[in-house]
UniProtKB/Swiss-Prot annotation:
This is Large ribosomal subunit protein bL34. GO terms for biological process: translation. Signal peptide: none annotated. GO terms for molecular function: structural constituent of ribosome.
């Protein structure tokens, strides 16, 4: 049986990366929340 998680760095960054977050208003809200919380890593991208 094929598993559901087939890792791909490109797909990961396109959907959850920093530039993807910055592209929408809600994505920017996500970053703002994570900054306020003090997260070391704001997004999955390096």
């Amino acid at each position: 049986m094929k598993r559901t998680f087939q890792p791909s760095v490109l797909k990961r960054n396109r959907s959850h990366g920093f530039r993807a977050r910055m592209a929408t208003k809600n994505g920017r809200q996500v970053l703002a929340r994570r900054r306020a919380k003090g997260r070391t890593r704001l997004t999955v991208s390096k």
